[in-house]
């Protein structure tokens, strides 16, 4: 959807966009399957908003109460805020495009959604990459001088890196929209012999456009893969060393290391799937209403939800806070009945 350009005339642009969004000829899906996809997407959005909201609330409360927060907590606050905003935006976009297509097809509304979508996705990718980078620097066991110096300075660098990521994501999202706008405005119409039909050059140099749209995905993706892989290898090596010296099979330290390896592996898989789905979605390899395009949307919605549930399960503090919240919610109706 983001990669498609439209002719310069506003009314014709809106008409073409509305036709493209709801053209039944492009739809391969039955009404039942469309309803099912919408239900799955809405469930994923709600789960993601609740899970990320919980993580943000816990660390924000710690930040306010103690006037300070851990570096990992700071990253998680930034990451949770970006994901809540992204999930809310996607849910709002589906609602508006389904109920008021004419309003959604207006230039200001349409491009506002697209700029926000790109910006929040890139922010989420960058923040998750910095979280992986921070864990790698703090946990991995390497003795290189540069690595040890980075470990000493990483706490002070993270706040600057987070705000730099926001600036890079915003600049890139604006750049992507400007590229598409300039490209569309320079796609001159070709008149037919009777001057009643116009053919617009709307998909020239698709590879170049896809490159510009997806440039912001590659760097955080590579950084996340490298740091997560190196951290897994470091933990695996340390676990094997502990196993050779362990006296019992139920060593709590070894179980903690194995749990960390599994959690990071899940993070890595989710991150890669999300980045690939986002790449395909922005590149418009498939029709808007096709099953593959909807599958990309489901994966992109599942990533913030799944990636947020795992820290709640693996982090002892978050797990305890979640159990306390469940207990309060369970007791709350009983207090009203007394």
Curated annotation (Swiss-Prot):
Bilayer topology term: Multi-pass membrane protein
Pfam families per record: TAS2R (PF05296)
Intervals, Cytoplasmic compartment: 52-74, 138-156, 227-262, 313-338
Keyword Membrane: yes
Location (main, coarse): membrane
InterPro entries: TAS2R
Residue spans, topological domain Extracellular: 1-30, 96-116, 178-205, 284-291
Gene Ontology CC annotation, any one: membrane
Function: Receptor that may play a role in the perception of bitterness and is gustducin-linked. May play a role in sensing the chemical composition of the gastrointestinal content. The activity of this receptor may stimulate alpha gustducin, mediate PLC-beta-2 activation and lead to the gating of TRPM5.
Something else known: Most taste cells may be activated by a limited number of bitter compounds; individual taste cells can discriminate among bitter stimuli.
Similarity remark: Belongs to the G-protein coupled receptor T2R family.
Protein name, as recorded: Taste receptor type 2 member 39
Species for this entry: Pan troglodytes
Lineage: Eukaryota, Metazoa, Chordata, Craniata, Vertebrata
